[in-house]
Design a protein with these regions (language model features):
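Conserved CoA-thioester-binding segment of acyl-CoA-metabolizing enzymes
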Residues: 1-47
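Terminal peptide-recognition signature
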Residues: 5, 9, 23-24, 42, ...
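Crotonase-fold acyl-CoA enzyme core
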Residues: 86-182
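Phosphate-coordinating loops and pocket residues in cytosolic domains that bind phosphorylated ligands
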Residues: 15-18, 58, 67, 159, ...
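Glycine- (often His-adjacent) and acidic-residue-rich active-site loop
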Residues: 12, 44-87, 103, 132-134
Length: 182
């Protein structure tokens, strides 16, 4: 059986906030504990009703980011995305990321830590925004990306913040397959 976990905030490019990461951790834990589940699909709902753009995840919601980091609805500063990366990376089941559109910043790092990535030929775009938002990936995303594409290319991706198409991501070994969106 397959568990599908999907971000569902398409109006903000499926950006995560503290509540989103808590929900993601809960869903991953449930999938891990369910002995009938063999594969986890990590994906996203969309497109955005505002502009029709598809997104997997744009990383941390900058509107939830305060001077001391990301602030939850309860006023506490936390984002726990590293816990989600760790859980995905060490899940005793296959975790396949299905990228229907933009995979940006922390969303890009999430696809990197998955066992496999399938990218929409028509809509998937990959980008790191660390330099743009002055929030560098101190977790698994940067290390695993370097293993996938090499040190120099990984630094280029993280430091320059360029957009990469699904085909470019495939060509450099970042995704396993480029598939039709439908």
């Amino acid at each position: 059986n397959v568990a599908r976990i999907a971000f569902n905030r398409p109006e903000v490019r499926n950006a995560f906030r503290p509540k989103t990461t808590s929900e993601l951790l809960d869903a991953l834990h449930d999938a891990q504990e369910d002995t009938s589940i063999g594969v986890v699909l990590l994906s996203a709902e969309g497109p955005s009703s505002k502009d029709g753009v598809w997104s997997f995840c744009s990383g941390g919601d900058q509107k939830a980011r305060g001077e001391k980091g990301y602030v939850g609805d309860d006023g506490y500063h936390r984002l726990n995305i590293l816990d989600a990366q760790r859980m995905i990376r060490f899940m005793p089941k296959a975790v396949i990321c299905v990228v229907p559109g933009w995979a940006v910043g922390g969303g890009h790092s999430l696809h990197v830590v998955c066992d496999m990535t399938l990218a929409s030929k028509e809509h998937a775009i990959f980008k790191q925004t660390d330099a743009d938002v002055t929030s560098f990936d101190g977790g698994y995303g940067s290390a695993y990306l370097a293993k996938m594409v090499g040190q120099k290319r990984a630094r280029e991706i993280f430091f320059l913040g360029r957009n990469y198409s699904a085909q470019e991501a495939f060509d450099m070994g970042m995704v396993n397959a480029v598939v039709p969106h439908d």
